[in-house]
Amino acid sequence: VEQLQRLKSEFGASRYLTEARRQALAQELRLNEAQIKIWFQNKRAKLKKANGLRNPLALH
């Protein structure tokens, strides 16, 4: 639960992480960098999909 809150907090601050920030976050949360990277990728994709559904008139 704490890991998820921390990830959400980081995502709120910035949707993209630098390599150094990803490494620090991975160490802090005891996850590997790939897990952090994938979580951010999935979160961005989910957000993009949700925004697309809310605006059906947007050009794709």
From Swiss-Prot:
The keyword Nucleus applies. SMART domains: HOX. Transmembrane segments: none annotated. CDD domains: homeodomain. Its main location: nucleus. Keywords: Developmental protein, DNA-binding, Homeobox, Nucleus. One of its GO terms (biological process) is neuron differentiation. One of its GO terms (cellular component) is nucleus. InterPro entries: Engrailed_Homeobox_TFs (IPR050720), HD (IPR001356), HD_metazoa (IPR020479), Homeobox_CS (IPR017970), Homeodomain-like_sf (IPR009057). Residues 1-41 bind DNA. Gene3D superfamilies: Homeodomain-like. It is found in: Nucleus. It holds the Pfam family Homeodomain. GO terms for molecular function: DNA-binding transcription factor activity, RNA polymerase II-specific; RNA polymerase II cis-regulatory region sequence-specific DNA binding. The keyword DNA-binding applies. Belongs to the engrailed homeobox family. This is Homeobox protein engrailed-like B. It comes from Myxine glutinosa (Atlantic hagfish).
